[in-house]
């Protein structure tokens, strides 16, 4: 009779759970009721196993340790939701999924999370070492001191995933620890949509720690636009200096001026197509019969980066430490020191071994917002 009574009570409890599953409510009071019955179900199974029963009706009774562990978890979640019901967030939508045990145990543990979005961390900057994580839009945390509930936004930095509460940062995923498992160099990149967070540059203001990136497709389009508009004559420019300020001797500036006068307008040409050529320079001047991007054997494909000096320095630092194999040389930050240019913008020039290397660079690297990139060719006889 005792076993039959226990079986009836267990059946009634499980019927209530089925009703709640079918209801699929988004109200917190229904989720509290759900966990009340889960708690009751596990308590009955625990008592049955404690009494030596291995079956109640048609249901097998798990081991004592399993039923005890499930009962404790159900009590923990049930009490948490009861506390949440007294907060200002009780009338928000709460579903079976958002109040599940899996959600409770997901990092950050012992709190509730909503609006998760995936991000990818590329350890050592390599695609095959990419690991996905979830950054939460909102995290509901109960203060251990006051028992009050706080709704705080989830945040992402180069260091990891965290939230701030009562003036303190709480990291629940630390990428440095993850790098020990998935990487070798101790470096990584955080990719979140069109945003990429690189390693902060110590020599640059902290405001540059996280730079919003533009997608590769947008970067390529931007490069094409800039090349057409700003490099109407992608000439093989003479040697450039790598000091902070580029100052060319007067006679060399005159030579460059003569070279440009002898080149035809190439605004209607494909500025990205390079044709191999032999001796295109005659007595120090470029052969005027050559058109487009036909440069002499000393020319190399380059990209000129234009923008704020600090941002350029930081970006160059990141490139040198994350993808040094994707370019040949990088200049120091330089400025125009003469002529009619009044801009205060700085430049960094990247040299490439060949066009294919530059293409690989553009396919893998996104140009930060605020930095303008222009492709072209420069003489490398230095």
UniProtKB/Swiss-Prot annotation:
UniProt region (Transactivation domain), positions on chain = 1-204
**UniProt keyword terms in alphabetical order:** Activator, DNA replication, DNA-binding, Early protein, Host nucleus, Isopeptide bond, Phosphoprotein, Repressor, Transcription, Transcription regulation, Ubl conjugation
Q: What Pfam families does the record tag this protein with?
A: PPV_E2_C, PPV_E2_N
Give the principal location in a single coarse category: host cell
Organism of this sequence: Human papillomavirus type 61
Q: Name the domain of life this protein comes from.
A: Viruses
Molecular function, one GO term: nucleotide binding
Its post-translational modification remark reads:
Phosphorylated.
Q: Where in the cell is it found?
A: Host nucleus
Bias regions of kind Polar residues — which residues? 278-294
Q: Name one GO cellular component term.
A: host cell nucleus
Q: What is this protein called?
A: Regulatory protein E2
Q: Where is this cross-link: Glycyl lysine isopeptide (Lys-Gly) (interchain with G-Cter in SUMO)?
A: 306
Which stretches does the entry tag as region Disordered?
213-294
* Chain intervals for the UniProt region annotation (DNA-binding domain): 299-382
The protein's role, per its UniProt record: Plays a role in the initiation of viral DNA replication. A dimer of E2 interacts with a dimer of E1 in order to improve specificity of E1 DNA binding activity. Once the complex recognizes and binds DNA at specific sites, the E2 dimer is removed from DNA. E2 also regulates viral transcription through binding to the E2RE response element (5'-ACCNNNNNNGGT-3') present in multiple copies in the regulatory regions of the viral genome. Activates or represses transcription depending on E2RE's position with regards to proximal promoter elements including the TATA-box.
The UniProt family comment states: Belongs to the papillomaviridae E2 protein family.
Listed Low complexity bias regions: 227-249
Q: How does it assemble?
A: Binds DNA as homodimer. Interacts with protein E1; this interaction greatly increases E1 DNA-binding activity. Interacts with protein L1; this interaction enhances E2-dependent replication and transcription activation. Interacts with protein L2; this interaction inhibits E2 transcriptional activity but not DNA replication function E2. Interacts with protein E7; this interaction inhibits E7 oncogenic activity. Interacts with host TAF1; this interaction modulates E2-dependent transcriptional regulation. Interacts with host BRD4; this interaction mediates E2 transcriptional activation function.
């Amino acid at each position: 009779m005792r076993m039959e009574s226990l079986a009836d009570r267990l059946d009634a409890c499980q019927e209530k759970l089925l009703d709640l599953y079918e209801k699929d409510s988004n109200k917190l009071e229904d989720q509290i009721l759900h966990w009340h019955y889960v708690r009751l179900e596990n308590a009955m199974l625990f008592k049955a196993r404690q009494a030596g029963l291995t079956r109640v009706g048609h249901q097998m009774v798990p081991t004592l340790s399993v039923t005890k562990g499930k009962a404790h978890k159900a009590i923990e979640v049930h009490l948490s939701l009861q506390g949440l019901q007294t907060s200002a967030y009780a009338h928000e939508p709460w579903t079976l999924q958002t109040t599940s045990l899996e959600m409770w145990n997901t990092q950050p543990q012992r709190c509730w999370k909503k609006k998760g979005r995936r991000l990818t961390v590329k350890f050592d900057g390599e695609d095959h070492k990419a690991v996905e994580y979830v950054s939460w839009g909102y995290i509901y945390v109960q203060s251990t001191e006051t028992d009050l509930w706080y709704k705080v936004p989830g945040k992402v930095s180069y260091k990891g995933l965290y939230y701030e509460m009562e003036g303190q940062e709480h990291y629940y995923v630390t990428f440095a620890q993850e790098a020990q498992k998935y990487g070798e160099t101790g470096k990584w990149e955080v990719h979140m949509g069109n945003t990429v967070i690189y390693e902060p540059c110590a020599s640059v203001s902290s405001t540059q720690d996280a730079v919003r990136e533009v997608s590769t497709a947008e970067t390529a389009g931007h490069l094409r636009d800039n090349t057409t508009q700003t490099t109407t004559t992608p000439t093989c420019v003479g040697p450039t200096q790598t000091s902070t300020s580029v100052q060319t001797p007067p006679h060399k500036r005159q030579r460059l001026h003569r070279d440009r006068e002898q080149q035809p307008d190439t605004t209607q040409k494909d500025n990205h197509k390079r044709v191999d050529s032999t001796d295109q320079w005659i007595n120090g001047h470029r052969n005027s019969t050559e058109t487009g991007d036909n440069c002499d054997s000393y020319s190399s494909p380059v990209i000129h980066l234009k923008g704020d000096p600090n941002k350029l320095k930081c970006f160059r630092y990141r490139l040198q430490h994350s993808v040094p194999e994707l370019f040949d040389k990088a200049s120091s930050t330089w400025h125009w020191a003469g002529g009619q240019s009044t801009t205060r913008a700085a430049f960094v020039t990247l040299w490439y071994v060949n066009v294919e290397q530059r293409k690989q660079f553009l396919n893998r690297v996104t140009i930060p917002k605020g930095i303008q990139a222009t492709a072209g060719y420069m003489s490398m006889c230095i």
